Curated annotation (Swiss-Prot):
<keyword id="KW-0732">Signal</keyword>
<keyword id="KW-0843">Virulence</keyword>
<dbReference type="GO" id="GO:0051715">
    <property type="term" value="P:cytolysis in another organism"/>
</dbReference>
<comment type="subunit">
    <text>Leukocidin consists of two protein components: F and S.</text>
</comment>
<keyword id="KW-0204">Cytolysis</keyword>
<feature type="signal peptide">
    <location>
        <begin position="1"/>
        <end position="29"/>
    </location>
</feature>
<dbReference type="Pfam" id="PF07968">
    <property type="entry name" value="Leukocidin"/>
</dbReference>
<dbReference type="InterPro" id="IPR036435">
    <property type="entry name" value="Leukocidin/porin_MspA_sf"/>
</dbReference>
<dbReference type="GO" id="GO:0005576">
    <property type="term" value="C:extracellular region"/>
</dbReference>
<protein>
    <recommendedName>
        <fullName>Leukocidin-S subunit</fullName>
    </recommendedName>
</protein>
<keyword id="KW-0800">Toxin</keyword>
<dbReference type="InterPro" id="IPR003963">
    <property type="entry name" value="Bi-component_toxin_staph"/>
</dbReference>
<comment type="function">
    <text>Leukocidin causes cytotoxic changes in polymorphonuclear leukocytes.</text>
</comment>
<keyword id="KW-0354">Hemolysis</keyword>
<dbReference type="GO" id="GO:0090729">
    <property type="term" value="F:toxin activity"/>
</dbReference>
<dbReference type="InterPro" id="IPR016183">
    <property type="entry name" value="Leukocidin/Hemolysin_toxin"/>
</dbReference>
<comment type="similarity">
    <text>Belongs to the aerolysin family.</text>
</comment>
Amino acid sequence: MLKNKILATTLSVSLLAPLANPLLENAKAANDTEDIGKGSDIEIIKRTEDKTSNKWGVTQNIQFDFVKDTKYNKDALILKMQGFISSRTTYYNYKKTNHVKAMRWPFQYNIGLKTNDKYVSLINYLPKNKIESTNVSQTLGYNIGGNFQSAPSLGGNGSFNYSKSISYTQQNYVSEVEQQNSKSVLWGVKANSFATESGQKSAFDSDLFVGYKPHSKDPRDYFVPDSELPPLVQSGFNPSFIATVSHEKGSSDTSEFEITYGRNMDVTHAIKRSTHYGNSYLDGHRVHNAFVNRNYTVKYEVNWKTHEIKVKGQN
């Protein structure tokens, strides 16, 4: 049921002249070897690993790009974290009541990378700052000698010998780094604000997503239709994040990395109430972070010599 894909590509980059057209990640996968320029000062060796959990509603697609640079005194690895995190939005009767319906939905998506290897250090990552735009596009570039730099957009990579880009959509959500140190980085993609028929609403509004049909028996009808829900609530999130790590040459042959995808869930209650005149309406009540860290974590073993990737465990 689970498929592992391995893509090996060796790329050569000349030290003598920078690339006029830098190598991008979408080089044809059919080519096992691609030579860029003259000489072989840099080799980029690529691996890809896919893991899916039906239990958690998550697919991890991880690209491992080994950077072998004769002008850099360390090993380097670029990890691009892609895949899909299902929203797991659910509608149900609250504690078998007839007048209270519940909507469980993702207030936050979690993406994280961690290692405990003393010879490994996190040296760069994307995105870095809080990003509120709907469409996120950034590039991480590498120049010979261990120089990693980031560019703000997909078009800002002209001076790099090698580059890796991220691009994702986060309508009504914002991205920010929640934790970061030399061994780990954790991002949160959090609900922000929503345009509704009654105006702009904060992600913390108690009436957010509460609908207009208090006489229905179907819990789904107590909340707004799918056409009024953003994709990250209705369907899910396609992450695209990058982390770059260095490894001390001549130390350990292997290192382990834990990569986590998941979500924190809020619950909105739609409560049927009546006015003094007997008219029914729906009143919202909110439970923030009702279910947190509903995460799928996979432990990957990286071999710095053979460039093999092994899955060592998952929850």
